[in-house]
Amino acid sequence: MMIAGIDEAGKGPVIGPMCIGGVKIEESRAHILKVLGVADSKKLTPKKREQLASQIKKHADGFFILEITPAQIDELRKIMSMNEIMVICFAKVLEQLKPDIVYADAADVKAERFAENLRRQYAKTNPAHAKKIEIISMHQADAIYPVVSAASIIAKVRRDELIEEIKKEWSVDFGSGYPSDPKTKAFLLKWGKEHDGKFPEIVRQSWQTVENIREELEKAGKK
């Protein structure tokens, strides 16, 4: 029986893409993930995550990483919530893996509702399999199921790679890209001042952080 885990990396940042990782492995071999030392990606150092990501890909029966750009996120947010975006993204990863059982980190305050919505979305492209597949959705699933931890790790490593590529390409250092990061805020404020309140394509324009900075700049300009 094939099991899979799905998790995201980069749902909250104001800068950079979001990555959804999926890992599939034969249930009888899933213990190897524990042997490798797979754990919640947030508790691992970047170097350890990179090492584990390589091992996970080597031992898994399948894996897939979906990358969503800031522009794609902004477009989707015009017509739906972030939770609805997560359902669509998780379903796209599920389409690539098609396991018998999937463990998903719930991107909804109600885990059961997330599972139902995921099944409904998946059924649009895989109606027959959607009836048979077992979907287990839980909060903090990456801390409970090693297969979800594995998915979280490969997603996080890929996002980190993309963030480093962005920093090199744009010759900027904006820190982690999270709204709570002072370095990220300072970068956005400086860029906004220098570019008349306009931000580059690496920034999620629909984030409240960006709106707040625009308002701040507008007020400062009126003084």
Curated annotation (Swiss-Prot):
HAMAP family: RNase_HII_A. It is an enzyme of class 3 (hydrolase). Belongs to the RNase HII family. Keywords: Cytoplasm, Endonuclease, Hydrolase, Manganese, Metal-binding, Nuclease. CDD domains: RNase_HII_archaea_like. One of its GO terms (molecular function) is RNA-DNA hybrid ribonuclease activity. Its cofactor is Mn(2+); Mg(2+). Residues 1-219 form the RNase H type-2 domain. GO terms for biological process: DNA replication, removal of RNA primer; mismatch repair. It is found in: Cytoplasm. A divalent metal cation binds at D7, E8, D105. GO terms for cellular component: cytoplasm; ribonuclease H2 complex. Gene3D superfamilies: Ribonuclease H-like superfamily/Ribonuclease H, Ribonuclease hii. Domain 2. Its main location: cytoplasm. It comes from Methanosarcina acetivorans (strain ATCC 35395 / DSM 2834 / JCM 12185 / C2A). It catalyses: Endonucleolytic cleavage to 5'-phosphomonoester. This is Ribonuclease HII. The keyword Hydrolase applies. Its EC number is 3.1.26.4. It comes from the Archaea. Manganese or magnesium. Binds 1 divalent metal ion per monomer in the absence of substrate. May bind a second metal ion after substrate binding. Endonuclease that specifically degrades the RNA of RNA-DNA hybrids. The keyword Glycosyltransferase does not apply. It holds the Pfam family RNase_HII. InterPro entries: RNase_H2_suA (IPR004649), RNase_HII/HIII (IPR001352), RNase_HII/HIII_dom (IPR024567), RNase_HII_arc (IPR020787), RNase_HII_hlx-loop-hlx_cap_dom (IPR023160), RNaseH-like_sf (IPR012337), RNaseH_sf (IPR036397). PROSITE patterns: RNASE_H_2.
